[in-house]
Amino acid sequence: MSRFFTTGSDSESESSLSGEELVTKPVSGNYGKQPLLLSEDEEDTKRVVRSAKDKRFEELTNLIRTIRNAMKIRDVTKCLEEFELLGKAYGKAKSIVDKEGVPRFYVRILADLEDYLNELWEDKEGKKKMNKNNAKALSTLRQKIRKYNRDFESHITNYKQNPEQSADEDAEKNEEDSEGSSDEDEDDDGVSGTAFLKKKPDSSGESRKFHKKMEDDDEDSEDSEDEEWDTSSTSSDSDSEEEEGKQTVLASKFLKKAPTTEEDKKAAEKKREDKAKKKHDRKSKRMDEEEEDNEGGEWERVRGGVPLVKEKPKMFAKGTEITHAVVIKKLNEILQVRGKKGTDRATQIELLQLLVQIASENNLGVGVIVKIKFNIIASLYDYNPNLATYMKPEMWQMCLDCINELMDTLVAHSNIFVGENILEESENLHNFDQPLRVRGCILTLVERMDEEFTKIMQNTDPHSQEYVEHLKDEAQVCAIIERVQRYLEEKGTTEEICQIYLRRILHTYYKFDYKAHQRQLTPPEGSSKSEQDQAENEGEDSAVLMERLCKYIYAKDRTDRIRTCAILCHIYHHALHSRWYQARDLMLMSHLQDNIQHADPPVQILYNRTMVQLGICAFRQGLTKDAHNALLDIQSSGRAKELLGQGLLLRSLQERNQEQEKVERRRQVPFHLHINLELLECVYLVSAMLLEIPYMAAHESDARRRMISKQFHHQLRVGERQPLLGPPESMREHVVAASKAMKMGDWKTCHSFIINEKMNGKVWDLFPEADKVRTMLVRKIQEESLRTYLFTYSSVYDSISMETLSDMFELDLPTVHSIISKMIINEELMASLDQPTQTVVMHRTEPTAQQNLALQLAEKLGSLVENNERVFDHKQGTYGGYFRDQKDGYRKNEGYMRRGGYRQQQSQTAY
C-alpha cells in the first residue's frame, strides 16, 4: 500500500509545515483500514493533486468565512485578528493573483468589511455599549481597512457600482470550475476559489432568492447522488463538502477515476450535457418566477411568527356571571403585574379598555367605569418607563380622549366624588342610593398631561411641520385644563384650585393678546355695534383673567412656590403688554430679587425670563436706564441662553456628567416660549450705547472713570482691533458703527446704522409696535447725540445758539432747552443760558486738553514719589511709618521715629 494514503502528497506536507492552512480534523477510525473501502479498479486510478491556486484560495475563503461569522456576532476583536491573517495570506498568494487577477470574493469582503465598520462607527449608542477591547479594535481596524483598501479602490468601486453582476460572475465561474474539474486532464487547477464563498443575497427580495438558492443546491445534490462513483462527481462532491465546512479523509479526497474506454467517455459527456440542460431549465424557470413576482409588486418584510389575525384576549371564562366583584377582581389582577419586568404595557392598556367595554355592556354603573378609566390614563403615563422619553402620537391622542371622556362622565354625574383621600375600602362603586365614591385625583392626571405635552414639545424639532402639528394640541390641553378648573371650583379644595389656576396661568402669561390690543387702539365710539357684540362674546381679556386668577392665589395660597410663580407670570404678562409701571411696582413690592437664589431651578428660570421681559418693556417705553439695569445681570454673565432655559452651552457640558445633563435638558422651555436672544442682546447694547457714549464724552479726561457696561466696551475694543473696517453686517457691528458716529455727534449716521432694512428684519420688526419703537429710538439718538456733542466740543465754543443746535439735531427748541437746562443743573455742563438771545454761554471752568494732560502727569508723578518714599522707609526699617492721612509729613520735616512708625511728639515748653 502506498504511503500516500496516510501521509498525503508532497505539496500538502510542505503547506502543512508553513502553518498557514487550517489543520484538517482527522476522521474517527484508522487510516490503515481505509484501503479496504476502495475497489480493485480504484487502486489503479490516477492520483490528482490540488493546485497551489486552490490551496491559497481555500485559505483565503476560510479566513473570510471566519470574518463574516465574527461580523454577525459583532466581535470586532476577532475581525481584526482574522483580517491581519487575511492580509498575510493574500501576500503569499500574490504570485497567483498577479496571473489570475484579484478574485471577486476578496474585493467583496473588503467592501463589506469597510461598510460594516462605518456602520458601527456611526452607531453612537452601539459604541457606548461596546467593551473596551471591541472599541479599541474598531478604531484600529477602521484605520487599517481604509489604508488597505486604497490599493483596491478601483476594484471596490466597480463592485459597488454593480454588485449583482459581480455575484453572477462568481456563480458562473464556480459552475465552470466545478464542471471543468470533472474532466480527466482538461484543467489542472481543479476547484475555483469562488466555490468556497457563499453568494451574497441581493438587497431586494432577500428571502425569496435565498430559498431559491437552497432549492438549487438540493437539486444539485440529488443529481450528484444519482451519478455513479466512477464518474467525475468525486471532485464536485468534495467541493460541496468543503463549502459546508466538513473535512474529509485525504485519501478519498484526491482519488479520481479516469475513463478508460470510449463508452465511458461518451457516457460522461452525455451526463454533463444532461446536467447543463437541467441547470439551464432551472435558470429560466427562476427568471419566469421573478418576473411574476415583480408584476405582483414589491416584497414586503413581515415579522415571522406573528399571526395575521390577532385574537382578542379572553377576560372571563365562558358562562361567568359579570358582576362588580368579578370586574374589580380582574382589574386588580391586571394592576398587580403593572410595572413588573416583562409586562407588555400595550396589552395591559388593551385589557383595561376591554374591561371598560365589558362593564358598560353589563350595565355595572359609572362608578366602575370611572375607576377603570383612571387606571387606563395612569397606564398610558407609565407606558414609557424612561422619564426622558415622550409619548408616541397615538398614545398622546388616546390620553386626551380618555381624559375628555372621564371629564364628560364626571360632569354628567354630579353624584360621583373622586379624591385621593378616599380609601379603596371606603369606595362606593355600585350602591346608587348613596353618592358614589371613587379613589383618584383628576388634578394629578391633568398636571401629568401638561408635563407630557411639555416633554413632547421639548423633543420635537422646532423647525419642522411636526412641531406645528403638536402645537395645535395646546388648544385641547387648555380646554381640558379649563374644564377641570370649572369642576374643581365646584368640588375641589382651595389647594387644588390654586394648583389648577397656576396651570391655567402658565398657558396664558406668555401669549400676547392681539385682540385686546386692537380694542385698546380702536376707541369704542369708532367701532360698530357688531364688533362690540363680538368682543363681548369672546369673553374676558387675558389681562382680566390673569388678574382674577393671580389675586385668588395671592389670597388663598399657603405655599411660597405657587405664589412666586403666579407673581412672576403676572409681571411677565404686564411687561409683555407694555404696562411698565404695574410690572415694576409688582416686582418691587414682592421683594423676589432678595431671595430668588433659594428657589428651585425652574422658578429661577422663570424669574430670569421675567426680568428680561421687564427690560424689553422698559426699552419700548424709552426708559433706557431701567432697561439696562434689568438686562445687566443676564447679559453680563455670557450665559443668557442657559439662564433663560433655552439651551445648554458647549463649555458647560464639560462641567456636568450625563445624568446632570439629562436633568438640565428636562428643564428647558419649549421653543414657542423662547425669547429671541439676538433681540435681547441688541436691546441691551443699544441701551448701553445711549448711556455709555455721553458718559465717556463727559469724563474723557478722567482716568478713573467707571464702565457702565463691560460687554459694550468689549464690543468697542473688538471693533477697534479690526485692521480693515468694511460695512457692518452683524447686529453687533451695526451697534459699534453707530457708537462711533454718536461719539462725533453725527446723529444721522448713527440713525442709519441702527435703523435700516437689515436691522428691521433682525430686530425691530419683531416688536408688537415696531413703528413706535423706531420713532422712540430716533428721538433718543437725537437727544443723546446732542448731549455728546456739547460734552465733546464745549471747550471749542464761547457760546452757541440753541436754534443752531435745534437745526443740527432736528429737535424742537423746548426739547433742546430742557436738555441743556438739565445738564447745567446736574453740573454736567459748566455754562449758563441767556434767555433773551437764546444762547448757551460757556464758562470755561473746565481745563483744556493740555491742562488735563498736565494734571494727569502731576498726579502720576506724585504717586511715583509716594511709592519711592514708602520703599525707602521699608529699607530703613520703618513699618507703616507713612500713612495717607499724614499729608506733607516729609515736606514739613515732621519727625518720624524709626520704630514702627510711631510719630515723635515734640515736647511743649510752658511759658
From Swiss-Prot:
It is found in: Cytoplasm. One of its GO terms (biological process) is translational initiation. Keywords: Acetylation, Cytoplasm, Initiation factor, Phosphoprotein, Protein biosynthesis. This is Eukaryotic translation initiation factor 3 subunit C. Component of the eukaryotic translation initiation factor 3 (eIF-3) complex, which is required for several steps in the initiation of protein synthesis. The eIF-3 complex associates with the 40S ribosome and facilitates the recruitment of eIF-1, eIF-1A, eIF-2:GTP:methionyl-tRNAi and eIF-5 to form the 43S pre-initiation complex (43S PIC). The eIF-3 complex stimulates mRNA recruitment to the 43S PIC and scanning of the mRNA for AUG recognition. The modification Phosphothreonine is found at T522. The keyword Protein biosynthesis applies. Component of the eukaryotic translation initiation factor 3 (eIF-3) complex, which is composed of 13 subunits: EIF3A, EIF3B, EIF3C, EIF3D, EIF3E, EIF3F, EIF3G, EIF3H, EIF3I, EIF3J, EIF3K, EIF3L and EIF3M. The eIF-3 complex appears to include 3 stable modules: module A is composed of EIF3A, EIF3B, EIF3G and EIF3I; module B is composed of EIF3F, EIF3H, and EIF3M; and module C is composed of EIF3C, EIF3D, EIF3E, EIF3K and EIF3L. EIF3C of module C binds EIF3B of module A and EIF3H of module B, thereby linking the three modules. EIF3J is a labile subunit that binds to the eIF-3 complex via EIF3B. Residues 155-165, 520-529 have a biased composition (Polar residues). One of its GO terms (cellular component) is eukaryotic 48S preinitiation complex. The gene is Eif3c. PROSITE patterns: PCI (PS50250). Belongs to the eIF-3 subunit C family. Residues 8-21 have a biased composition (Low complexity). SUPFAM superfamilies: Winged helix' DNA-binding domain. Phosphorylated. Phosphorylation is enhanced upon serum stimulation. Residues 199-208, 259-276, 884-897 have a biased composition (Basic and acidic residues). GO terms for molecular function: ribosome binding; RNA binding; translation initiation factor activity; translation initiation factor binding. Residues 166-190, 216-230 have a biased composition (Acidic residues). The modification N6-acetyllysine is found at K99, K641.
